[in-house]
Amino acid sequence: MEGSKTSNNSTMQVSFVCQRCSQPLKLDTSFKILDRVTIQELTAPLLTTAQAKPGETQEEETNSGEEPFIETPRQDGVSRRFIPPARMMSTESANSFTLIGEASDGGTMENLSRRLKVTGDLFDIMSGQTDVDHPLCEECTDTLLDQLDTQLNVTENECQNYKRCLEILEQMNEDDSEQLQMELKELALEEERLIQELEDVEKNRKIVAENLEKVQAEAERLDQEEAQYQREYSEFKRQQLELDDELKSVENQMRYAQTQLDKLKKTNVFNATFHIWHSGQFGTINNFRLGRLPSVPVEWNEINAAWGQTVLLLHALANKMGLKFQRYRLVPYGNHSYLESLTDKSKELPLYCSGGLRFFWDNKFDHAMVAFLDCVQQFKEEVEKGETRFCLPYRMDVEKGKIEDTGGSGGSYSIKTQFNSEEQWTKALKFMLTNLKWGLAWVSSQFYNK
């Protein structure tokens, strides 16, 4: 509801809208002069058969202004009933709506508000008594009436069909009735028979249902067992594959280990660890040159490393034979190896040197080389105790510290550096390494199987 007010004329214009299309409406002029009787007629409830009481008299119906409920009995047992239409506003008033203008006497705002409230309440009451919301515009009302006419036609057609069926039933004679009674009895017997069959079928259905439940339960149990067996089979298959892989891996490792074992059995540890050879005029051990020449000044670090390998070789051969050297003890210590005097524990004979002027005046290095030559001589004598035919290619004179070339020039070469040339010292060291190589070969041949 919309409203507007003009201060000059003190006029309130109020518009209602259609409850279907929401278009503004103009009320009929009759709404301006609504009295109490007219409002009661518009708001009176619709009369239905459910509202009519059995004890109401014709006089009460007449006084109430409602048309009576008419029932016309007939001899054929069929009652004709006529239900009068509900009393409502005329078509003209139903199609005319919504505007409350100014009061005829120029009433106050209270009068206008009261009229608006009365009109609004009137529409609310009318909407509450039917399935249609009020107010409606003329077009929506026409549409609604068309729909109601269609429903009325459908209802009248149904009524005509019922009447025709009733007339057909009334025209049936007695014979048809007896025949129908017989057919009815036969159908009743057939019904009993079918009911009995249905009961039997129902019993069988219950039995089959119980059996089906048992079979389904058994099938479900078997499915679960099958799934469990499948999982176990898959797990065992996985374990088998893993074990097969492990077995193949172990077999490969065994073959590799056997190959390595066969290779190691054929490998001489001493020959593999200590490779003694020569490089020109130098004797070498593990590619370290032992000695130096004026034309080839070998670094002392390399010479010291060669002496360390030589000490380690003799120490390993002695341990293999169980030989304990007299007078000296070998101490392999890399390029700082030395010999320890057994008669004087505090005396160490270094088998390494840094060169320089001190090298010419310090005779500890020479004493250490002579002591080492003494240990080689003890090793030779120990071997000759068990093998009389054993003989080294170069004879050693420990007291003089020299090595003799018995199979060659017949000369002797000093292992000392003082008062000796580098050529002779280098040749003496080369002969000493050759003797150690022979000793290495003998130990390898004697202790190879062990």
Swiss-Prot record:
Region Interaction with BCL2 and BCL2L1 isoform Bcl-X(L), annotated ranges: 112-159
Membrane topology field: Peripheral membrane protein
Region of interest (Evolutionary conserved domain (ECD)), ranges: 245-450
InterPro entries, alphabetized: Atg6/Beclin, Atg6/Beclin_C_sf, Atg6/beclin_CC, Atg6_BARA, BH3_dom
Record-listed Phosphoserine modification sites: S15, S30, S90, S93, S96
Something else known: Expanded poly-Gln tracts inhibit ATXN3-BECN1 interaction, decrease BECN1 levels and impair starvation-induced autophagy.
Protein name listed in UniProt: Beclin-1
